[in-house]
C-alpha cells in the first residue's frame, strides 16, 4: 500500500515531469540570495535557461527599467538531456520596508520574448497528477503562455516569525468531528461525507481537556460557510457557518482560549473557493461580470482552472488586483475583528508567487506576531521558496519519514535518524516547520501499523524531539483510528471519524502524550 503523502510527486514519472518542467524554458522560481533580504543587503536573483531556449539577453523588469542578467554557469542535466544555463543579477540593497516587484524575461535574437516562469510548472503538475489519480496516462506538457509569465515580489524587512510559534504545541481540530456541545448528541449521517454536528461551542467545552493535554495552540479546520463537511470550498469568507455556531461562537472561543494562553489559528483557503460562491456563480454565468477576470476560464473539460480539475473548486487568479485585495482583506479582517493568531494556509503552492508576499505583510500589519504557515506538498527546495514570504511550512518530509519508520515499517531507525539530521540542517531556524504524524487527508498512523501502540509512542517521542513545533491531529493521542484505508476505496476522508470521549479513550496513550509534551516544554 502506498501512502501518497506527496500526491504531485507520487510516482517516478511525476517526479521526472516535475524535474524536467523546472529545467525547461526560463525558470526563476524565487532563486534569491539571501532568501529573506534585510535592509541594505545586496540581493542576487538567478534564473535557469533550458536547452531549447537561446536568449540574446535575460532582463529584469524593475520600476520601468530593464536590468541585464549575466550568464554565469553551464550545467549538464541528464534528465532533460541537455545543457542548462544559469544567469544572475545582483541588485543593490534596499531600505527597510521596500517591496521589490519585478518580472524576468529572456529575449532571443529575433526579438521573441519569454517571461519567467515558462513553462508554467504548477499547472502542468496539477493536470498530470489529476490524470494519474484517475488512472490515465500522463498528458503532454502544458506550456502555457510564454508572454504571460509570473510577477514576483520580495519584501526587504526585519520581520521574523513569532517567537511563540517556536514553542507551540499545536492541536488540529476538525470541527465537525470534535464535539457537538450544548448537550447535543452526534448526528448520524450515512457516511463520513455527511455532517456529524461538531461545533465551536463544543470546542469551548473541551478547552479543559486541550489545556490539560499541554496544548497551547489550536488549529481549526475551515469554519466558513460551505456546502461540504470539510469546508475547503467556501461560499462566504466573511462569516462562520451557523452549523458551527456562527461568528458569536468564534468570538467566544478566541476569548476563552486566550484566557488560558492558548492561541487560535484558522484554516484559510486562498487557492480556491466553492463553485456555489456568489462571486464565481456570477463570473461563470456572465462574461461581462465584474468578477470574470478573477478566474481563469479556458477550453478544458471543466471550463476553468480549478483545484486538481474539480469543478466544485474554481481557483482564483491573483494577477487580478481586485481578487487579490478581496482575499487579503478577508485574512486581515479575521485577525483584526476576531483576534485570531494566524493561519494554516491550504494548498499554498496554488496562488501566484507574489501573492504570499502581500498576504504575509498584510497579516503582520494587523498583528505583528501572527503565525502564517503553508501547506506546501512539494520538494524541500521548493518549500524554501517561501522563506521570507511566510513564517513556515508544514513539515511533510519528517511526517513521511516517521510514517515509513513507525507506520509502514519500511525504514529502520538508523535510516530515520540520518534523514532527520540532514533534513533539519537543510532549513534555517527562522523558518518554522510544524511536524505531524497524520492529518485529515491521510490514514492515521495507528491504522498504518495495524494498531501497534508502541510504534505510535516511538513516533510521538521522536516528533517531540524535532526542531519544529509538534502538531497533533485530534484523537491521535487517545488511539483514534478507522476501518478502511484512504488508498483502498475509503477516500482521503477516512481518518475524519468522530472524536471519542470518556471510556472510549486509551488512557495509557493519553497519559504518555501528556508526559512527552510536558518534557518538550521543559526542554524548550
Positions of PLM-derived features:
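Glycan-association/targeting regions that enable binding to alpha-glucans and other polysaccharides
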Residues: 1-167
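Conserved, mostly hydrophobic/aromatic
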Residues: 47, 173, 210, 220, ...
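Core domains of carbohydrate- and sulfate-ester-processing enzymes
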Residues: 127-131, 135, 143, 161-162, ...
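Hydrophobic faces of well-ordered beta-strands that scaffold small-molecule active sites
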Residues: 169-171, 218-220, 264-266, 343, ...
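Substrate-binding/active-site clefts of carbohydrate-active enzymes
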Residues: 170, 174-216, 223-337, 358-366, ...
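Active-site beta-loop-alpha junctions enriched in small/polar residues
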Residues: 176-178, 223-225, 269-271, 348-350, ...
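Active-site-proximal helices and loops of the catalytic beta/alpha 8
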Residues: 258-262, 280, 336, 346-429, ...
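Active-site clefts of carbohydrate-active enzymes
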Residues: 428-451
Amino acid at each position: 500500500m502506498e501512502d501518497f503523502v506527496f500526491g504531485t510527486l507520487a510516482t517516478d514519472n511525476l517526479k521526472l515531469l516535475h524535474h524536467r518542467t523546472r529545467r525547461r524554458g526560463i525558470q526563476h522560481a524565487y532563486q534569491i540570495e539571501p532568501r529573506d533580504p534585510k535592509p541594505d543587503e545586496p540581493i542576487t536573483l538567478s534564473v535557469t535557461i533550458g536547452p531549447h531556449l537561446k536568449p540574446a539577453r535575460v532582463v529584469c523588469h524593475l520600476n520601468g527599467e530593464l536590468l541585464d542578467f549575466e550568464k554565469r554557469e553551464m550545467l549538464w542535466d541528464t534528465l532533460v538531456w541537455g545543457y542548462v544555463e544559469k544567469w544572475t543579477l545582483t541588485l543593490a540593497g534596499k531600505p527597510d520596508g521596500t517591496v521589490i516587484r519585478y518580472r524576468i524575461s529572456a529575449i532571443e535574437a529575433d526579438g521573441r520574448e519569454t517571461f519567467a516562469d515558462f513553462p508554467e510548472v504548477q499547472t502542468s503538475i496539477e493536470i498530470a497528477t489529476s490524470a494519474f489519480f484517475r488512472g490515465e496516462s500522463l498528458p503532454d506538457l502544458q506550456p502555457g503562455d510564454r508572454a504571460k509569465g509570473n510577477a514576483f515580489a520580495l519584501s526587504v524587512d526585519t520581520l521574523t516569525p513569532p517567537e511563540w510559534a517556536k514553542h507551540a504545541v499545536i492541536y488540529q481540530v476538525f470541527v465537525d468531528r470534535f464535539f457537538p456541545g450544548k448537550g447535543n448528541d452526534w448526528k448520524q449521517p450515512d457516511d463520513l461525507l455527511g455532517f456529524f454536528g461538531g461545533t465551536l461551542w463544543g470546542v469551548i467545552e473541551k478547552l479543559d481537556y486541550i489545556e490539560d493535554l499541554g496544548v497551547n495552540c489550536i488549529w481549526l479546520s475551515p469554519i466558513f460557510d460551505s456546502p461540504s463537511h470539510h469546508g475547503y470550498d467556501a461560499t462566504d469568507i466573511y462569516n462562520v457557518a451557523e452549523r458551527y455556531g456562527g461568528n458569536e461562537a468564534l468570538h467566544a472561543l478566541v476569548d476563552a482560549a486566550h484566557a488560558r494562553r492558548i492561541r487560535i489559528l484558522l484554516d484559510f483557503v486562498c487557492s480556491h473557493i466553492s463553485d456555489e460562491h456568489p462571486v464565481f456563480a456570477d463570473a461563470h454565468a456572465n462574461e461581462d461580470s465584474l468578477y470574470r477576470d478573477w478566474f481563469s476560464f479556458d477550453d478544458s473539460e471543466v471550463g476553468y482552472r480549478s483545484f486538481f480539475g474539480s469543478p466544485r473548486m474554481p481557483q482564483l487568479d491573483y494577477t487580478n488586483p481586485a481578487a487579490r485585495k478581496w482575499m487579503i482583506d478577508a485574512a486581515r479582517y479575521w485577525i483584526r475583528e476576531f483576534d485570531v493568531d494566524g493561519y494554516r494556509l491550504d494548498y499554498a503552492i496554488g496562488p501566484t508567487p507574489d501573492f504570499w508576499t502581500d498576504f504575509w505583510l498584510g497579516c503582520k500589519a494587523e498583528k505583528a506576531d501572527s503565525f502564517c504557515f503553508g501547506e506546501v506538498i512539494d520538494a524541500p527546495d521548493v518549500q524554501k521558496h517561501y522563506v521570507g514570504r511566510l513564517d513556515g511550512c508544514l513539515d511533510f518530509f519528517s511526517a513521511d519519514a516517521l510514517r515509513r519508520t513507525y507506520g509502514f515499517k519500511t525504514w529502520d531507525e538508523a535510516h530515520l535518524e540520518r534523514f532527520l539530521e540532514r533534513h533539519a540542517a537543510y532549513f534555517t531556524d527562522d523558518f518554522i516547520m510544524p511536524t505531524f504524524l497524520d492529518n485529515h487527508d491521510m490514514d492515521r498512523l495507528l491504522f498504518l501499523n495495524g494498531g501497534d501502540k508502541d510504534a505510535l509512542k516511538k513516533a510521538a517521542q521522536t516528533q517531540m524531539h524535532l526542531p519544529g513545533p509538534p502538531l497533533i491531529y485530534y484523537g491521535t493521542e487517545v488511539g483514534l483510528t478507522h476501518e478502511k484505508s484512504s488508498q483502498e476505496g475509503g477516500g482521503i476522508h477516512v481518518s475524519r471519524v468522530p472524536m471519542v470521549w470518556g471510556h472510549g479513550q486509551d488512557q495509557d496513550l493519553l497519559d504518555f502524550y501528556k508526559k512527552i509534551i510536558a518534557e518538550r516544554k521543559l526542554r524548550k
